[in-house]
Amino acid sequence: MATTNATLQTLVQFYENCKNVKTRYKIINGRFGKISILSHKPTSKLYLQKTISAHNFNADEIKVHQLMSDHPNFIKIYFNHGSINNQVIVMDYIDCPDLFETLQIKGELSYQLVSNIIRQLCEALNDLHKHNFIHNDIKLENVLYFEALDRVYVCDYGLCKHENSLSVHDGTLEYFSPEKIRHTTMHVSFDWYAVGVLTYKLLTGGRHPFEKSEDEMLDLNSMKRRQQYNDIGVLKHVRNVNARDFVYCLTRYNIDCRLTNYKQIIKHEFLS
């Protein structure tokens, strides 16, 4: 009881010393969570507060925050509290753009920069996978790049799931692996396939490997059909041979021919 009271008192004091602020980078509410930025007046430190309806709350989100809280490429959690209606998570606010916004600012990124970003992302995901968790929503918007620190941050753990648990069509369709489309159980291949798609987007200014035009919106049937006929020639918009091969190796249709093992992925020439 004493510990509970002390925690409650700390939480009350924290909120008494905070105010809502706006930041220079765009903050977008997710489908299941409302985002606000808090400034702690005594320290001027910024925190990100995520409020999730109890109906949409995934307890694994908290578990991943706690497991990876001290990891340099994940977001540190400070408070987690809730009611019958909502769950609230207070975490570090990272003052940098996500990769979607980075592409909007810079356009197509250089081979060297993309290689650096993807290497850090692969290392971070491998550390998450060691805990038998799949991120399950790797995309441009869920990866931050702090250029001044040369550091990648993996964020938004709301769809994280245990390996071998049941899968559903959650997340962002254009990053779905063939296995996720077929509803196989959760597997690290879900994340590695998404890394392949994300890499292609960074190298081409936001294009998808299987789109026929820049403004095409891919649906589930188009994805299923085009994944089956993926060929290295399809990836023609990536000019660098090593980068093109990396994307191809991570997005091949047949999982037995695809790179899904971290030790093999990290040794690819694109990341060396």
From Swiss-Prot:
Which EC number(s) does UniProt give?
A: 2.7.11.1
Positions binding ATP in this chain are 27-35, 50
What is this enzyme's catalytic activity, as reactions?
Answer: L-seryl-[protein] + ATP = O-phospho-L-seryl-[protein] + ADP + H(+); L-threonyl-[protein] + ATP = O-phospho-L-threonyl-[protein] + ADP + H(+)
The protein's UniProt keywords, in alphabetical order, are:
ATP-binding, Kinase, Late protein, Nucleotide-binding, Serine/threonine-protein kinase, Transferase, Viral capsid assembly, Viral release from host cell
MF term (GO), any: protein serine kinase activity
Entries under Gene3D superfamilies matching the protein: Transferase(Phosphotransferase) domain 1
Please name the catalytic residues of this protein.
137 (proton acceptor)
Query: Is Nucleotide-binding found in the keyword set?
Result: yes
The task this protein performs is described as: Serine/threonine protein kinase that plays a role in viral propagation by phosphorylating various viral and cellular substrates including the viral p6.9 protein or host histone H1. Participates in nucleocapsid assembly and polyhedra formation.
Name assigned to this protein? Serine/threonine-protein kinase 1
Q: Upper taxonomic classification of the species?
A: Viruses, Viruses incertae sedis, Naldaviricetes, Lefavirales, Baculoviridae
**Gene behind the chain:** PK1
